[in-house]
């Protein structure tokens, strides 16, 4: 059964609803069209523009999902087993063809051990624990394990007081104290070793859990293939400049889209500040490594290398109390970045990749070069008068960029002729332009993240390089400001972003010197996307 929503051609079907599907339901992703012709079916995605030939099973499922359907309804309509339908639908979701609603809760909620490592954060830890006492989750299915990593503040007395308080409730609070400081990774391992339940939830002591935190993440484990899941991390206090910046620009913020974590995908790890793991998987991997920084990245990479699966579900939200003084902000950024060298030593195959596909790279270089030339000549004309011929020459790279854009468009048109479907020129042109512009952002982000300080130093000796740096930063800051929607004006956002990049690059260099490993500064160049 399908509804009567059609566009132009009666053989072209697509979903017209934009709200999220209901829990346990699947629906055709917005911007996806199904074209039925001569007994075959094609799916057309607007962004990124692609045409995919469908096998009969996928075609039937997608057609049914023009209206919201559950796995049970799809299984009944297709005659397939429910588990096979669920697997197939999940694959279509990861490919961007279907959209899934929130998972249905399990018949009975599984028990969870929450592990919180802490060092000298008595006030923050108390706030964190009270948020856990208010979770919308059966208290009888929870145990909270605090690992005090040899704190010297009021942590001990505060925990004794809370232990007496929860003793009168149906809640479990266990405290384990290290006699000497051993680090956050080892502290997480200590807590997991003491855990009595099959699911271990890691939470940092300076975080506050939302009431529905576990209810949103735990249902993911109904899929036995999932070894770990993480949720969204937002800023606890967004009323400060750095707090509002960290809210959407922190390395802990993974976006608002449900994703599958993959070593080759856009999301390669989950922060351990908000992560649930099957205890048997933690045991198999021998826990977290004894690293001062980057232990969560290392754990995720080892988990993925073992063949296990990991998902990111942004609905499971916690709030992180970021350090909002400038010195602390810069030091933390540099410390995070310094882990890159250690991670490369442990995972030599996970090198940073710089994509340089010829067409996209030529387009980006032409646009950036053209803007650089015009900016430089405009500045010079202020002092030496207008130079028409020089401006005309500076416009040449922009003309070359336009020619490359047209070349890429007609190249796509030729590819589309292999399919029995006509896609209008404006759609293909727009998709090509969007892809080229996205690559220009990718290239600019790569250069500003790792080479801002270097370009600043070089610009003292070669001033035109400073114009290039301004253009690269302008591209990145402009795109990110629109994409992330931070709660601040663009001027303050630009300042925070520049300080962020400088601190990060300094941290990478410091880590390279510390570990005598320079590969983080030298990417692997690939010419194929």
Language-model segment annotations:
Residues 130-141:
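Short, acidic, metal-binding catalytic loop of nucleotide-sugar glycosyltransferases
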Residues 231, 247-267:
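Short, flexible, basic/aromatic active-site loop/helix in glycosyltransferases
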Residues 313-376, 411-493, 497-500, 506-510, ...:
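Active-site-adjacent helix/loop segment of glycosyltransferases
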Residues 47-56, 61, 79-131:
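N-proximal low-complexity "stem/linker" segments adjacent to membrane-targeting elements
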Residues 212-244, 321:
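Conserved donor NDP-sugar-binding/catalytic core segment of glycosyltransferases
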Residues 178-195, 216, 261-265:
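Glycine-rich, basic loop-to-helix element that forms the pyrophosphate-binding segment
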Residues 200:
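Short aromatic/hydrophobic "clamp" motif used to bind/position activated sugar donors
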Residues 148-157, 180, 207:
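A conserved acidic beta->alpha catalytic loop
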């Amino acid at each position: 059964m399908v509804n009567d929503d059609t566009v132009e051609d009666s053989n072209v079907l697509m979903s017209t609803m934009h709200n999220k599907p209901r829990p346990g339901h699947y629906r055709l992703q917005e911007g996806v069209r199904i074209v039925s012709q001569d007994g075959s079916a094609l799916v057309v995605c607007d962004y990124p523009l692609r045409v995919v030939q469908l096998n009969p099973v996928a075609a039937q499922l997608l057609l049914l999902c023009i209206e919201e359907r559950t796995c049970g309804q799809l299984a009944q309509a297709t005659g397939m087993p429910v588990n096979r339908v669920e697997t197939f639908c999940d694959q279509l979701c990861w490919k961007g063809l279907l959209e899934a609603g929130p998972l249905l809760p399990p018949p009975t909620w599984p028990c969870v051990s929450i592990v919180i490592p802490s060092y000298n954060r008595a006030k923050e830890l108390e706030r964190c624990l009270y948020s856990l006492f208010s979770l919308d989750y059966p208290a009888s299915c929870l145990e909270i394990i605090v690992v005090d990593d040899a704190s010297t503040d009021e942590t001990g007395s505060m925990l004794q007081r809370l232990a007496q308080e929860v003793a009168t409730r149906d809640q479990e609070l266990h405290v384990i104290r290290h006699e000497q400081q051993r680090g956050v990774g080892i502290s997480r391992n200590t807590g997991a070793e003491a855990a009595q339940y099959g699911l271990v939830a890691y939470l940092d002591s300076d975080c506050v859990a939302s009431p529905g935190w576990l209810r949103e993440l735990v249902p993911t484990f109904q899929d036995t293939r999932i070894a770990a899941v993480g949720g969204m991390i937002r800023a606890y206090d967004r009323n400060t400049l750095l707090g509002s910046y960290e809210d959407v620009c922190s390395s802990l913020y993974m976006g608002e889209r449900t994703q599958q974590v993959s070593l080759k995908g856009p999301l390669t790890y989950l922060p351990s500040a908000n992560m649930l793991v099957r205890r048997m998987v933690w045991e198999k991997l021998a826990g977290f490594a004894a690293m001062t920084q980057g232990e969560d990245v290392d754990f995720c990479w080892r988990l993925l290398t073992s063949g296990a699966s990991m998902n990111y579900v942004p609905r499971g939200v916690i709030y992180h109390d970021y350090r909002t003084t400038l010195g602390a902000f810069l030091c933390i950024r540099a410390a995070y970045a310094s882990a890159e060298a250690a991670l490369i030593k442990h995972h030599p195959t996970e090198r940073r990749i710089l994509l340089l596909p010829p067409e996209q790279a030529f387009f980006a270089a032409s646009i950036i070069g053209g803007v650089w030339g015009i900016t430089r000549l405009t500045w010079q004309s202020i002092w030496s008068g207008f130079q028409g011929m020089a401006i005309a020459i500076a416009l040449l790279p922009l003309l070359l960029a336009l020619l490359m854009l047209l070349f890429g468009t007609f190249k796509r048109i030729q590819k589309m002729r292999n399919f029995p479907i006509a896609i209008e020129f404006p759609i293909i042109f727009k998709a090509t332009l969007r892809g080229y512009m996205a690559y220009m952002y990718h290239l600019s982000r790569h250069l500003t993240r790792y080479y801002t300080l270097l370009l600043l130093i070089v610009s003292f000796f070669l001033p035109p390089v400073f114009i290039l740096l301004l253009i690269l930063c302008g591209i990145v800051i402009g795109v990110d400001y629109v994409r992330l929607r931070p709660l601040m004006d663009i001027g303050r956002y630009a300042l925070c972003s520049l300080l962020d990049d400088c601190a990060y690059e300094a941290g990478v260099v410091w880590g390279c010197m510390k570990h005598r490993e320079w590969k983080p500064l030298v990417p692997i160049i690939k010419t194929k996307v």
